[in-house]
Amino acid sequence: MSSKMIVLMSSDGQSFEVEEAVAIQSQTIAHMVEDDCVADGIPLANVESKILVKVIEYCKKYHVDEANPISEEDLNKWDEKFMDLEQSTIFELILAANYLNIKSLFDLTCQTVADMIKGKTPEEIRSTFNIENDFTPEEEEAVRKENQWAFE
Amino acid sequence: MNCDRICELPDSLLTQVLSYLPTIDSVKTSVLSKRWEFLWLRVPVLDLKVSDFPDENYASFIDNFLEFNRKSRMRKFKLKYDEYTYDDDRLAGWVVTTVDRGIQHLDAKGFETNMCVREFMPQNIYKCNTLVSLMLVTVGIENPEFVVSLPSLKIMHLEDVWYYDDPLIMEKIISGCPVLEDFVLIRPIDFCNLDVLQFLRVRSLSLRSFRLTFEYSVSCTYFSVEIDAPRLEYLNFNDDQSDTIVVKNMTSLSMIDIDSEFNVKFGGSRLEPGDLRKRDIIRDFLTAISCVRHMIISRRTLEVLDRYSKLVPIPKFDNLYRLQAAVSRSMLQLLLVFLESCPNLENLILRVHLQDFTVSTEPEQDGLTYVPQCLLSSLECVEIRELIMGEETGEKLVRYFLKNSVVLKKLILRLEDSSIANQDSDIFKELSTFTKRSRSCEVIIIH
């Protein structure tokens, strides 16, 4: 039984053939399919090939059916491995998941970044993400005082 | 600016990321840089514990936050009274406010300041188009004053929640939740209101997972429970208090976790042959769940079934491919009788309890001679947990399975004492002397 395929085109001109059922996990793509404008392939101006490859990998894994019966426990383990990426890739994935409207991927990527912030001091967070502190010491102190409780 | 990619995300996505954090972590980001100073304020989430605030001014913080975001929607409100505070009845008011702002996730854990005093949730939790998950712990809920309407609610967790006197409260709530998938009900031991909710009926066309805990605390027979859920896939039944138990339409049931004595202590007093009513209850319960594929069963449940099986045979669990059971020393024979009801079992996990407080009325069987069907044709993997090598029961079991399982591929032994690390070779040597009916069987030892 052959399944319907559609073509996704990355911003840097690469084409990827994907099963329609897998691709429509993206609400954005699902709407385009409904509106029937996919004949020549779907151009994804905001997603470069390196990221689109990861997105397709995710969607394939999450397309659970008889051919791919996978338990929630196994999916969670897979998620961990999948998200073992460079920071810049993770942020690109957030942008892609947002643009393509793939809720579960968006949740996963945001949660991954949130976990990198959780429990850290501001200094540690700045260091993790290379954020420059443009407060003067007095300004920073004033901001801390606003919510003293969080910094104790 | 040398900032890594995170700064290239627009504000809207940064606030999204912050919404996955407890509020205390979100607030900390206010000092990261000027760009971050006010991002946390725009996060439509409050996720706090009272213990986050050393001087207990959580109330003014929450008030200020809600006031600042007066015009926006709230996605999640989570508040835990995890520490003693002067109870000031603020929780209900905050719930009213957040529900009015289109909340999707509401999670409130109250504090019992003294017996018979609880904070009760407002009526508007019964009418909310946006609520997707509701978790309430150690609070009270009132009788609904109107028809319950929670059209988006998928997850409901009620733990140690008090009710007033409406005997139909649970039915009213559930019938107002047409898409409810996941329900956890941990019933309180409410000594102030012992006769509340005597008849619990859980009837739902959408429910896929249900966990019920009702721990035995009163010697009586007036509690009963009925579960009617044709889409139910997972049932965790830990109700020890209900005397009448009816389970029906379990056509989708795939997994059951059962830990209950069916109130046999007092409702059936040792299950005398004359107690037909209890026998019928247990028979109907087992028949209703007989399509399960995966079962976890506790020791005391097995003991009740053992007593019961002397009156009427246990129905066959034809689809059961995976069984996890806890047994004690005197229960090995009982286990084999139960296994006879599982003719297609492939996977067996046993936990061995050495503590044995039940006095066996039967003479100790020296050898386990009986071999159930599944060992001859389907059982491929056996795992024995909390095993102490050198201890008689464990060894008996290991010998038994190796000797009698025709198609066994794996025997996994999880050892209790980690001190035997260097005795692995001794164990292996000894094991290799045991008779193995399945030549290709692999024995794996895990500490």
From Swiss-Prot, chain A:
Residues 94-152 are annotated as: Interaction with the F-box domain of F-box proteins. InterPro entries: SKP1, SKP1-like, SKP1-like_dim_sf, SKP1/BTB/POZ_sf, Skp1_comp_dimer, Skp1_comp_POZ. It is found in: Nucleus. GO terms for biological process: auxin-activated signaling pathway; jasmonic acid mediated signaling pathway; protein ubiquitination; response to auxin; response to jasmonic acid; ubiquitin-dependent protein catabolic process. SMART domains: Skp1. One of its GO terms (cellular component) is SCF ubiquitin ligase complex. CDD domains: BTB_POZ_SKP1 (cd18322). Pathway: Protein modification; protein ubiquitination. The keyword Nucleus applies. Expressed in young seedlings, roots, leaves, floral stems, inflorescences, and siliques, with a slightly higher level in inflorescence than in other tissues. Keywords: Nucleus, Ubl conjugation pathway. Belongs to the SKP1 family. Involved in ubiquitination and subsequent proteasomal degradation of target proteins. Together with CUL1, RBX1 and a F-box protein, it forms a SCF E3 ubiquitin ligase complex. The functional specificity of this complex depends on the type of F-box protein. In the SCF complex, it serves as an adapter that links the F-box protein to CUL1. Plays a role during early flowers reproductive development. Part of a SCF (SKP1-cullin-F-box) protein ligase complex. Interacts with ADO3/FKF1, COI1/FBL2, EBF1/FBL6, PP2B10, At3g61590 and At5g49610. This is SKP1-like protein 12. The gene is ASK12.
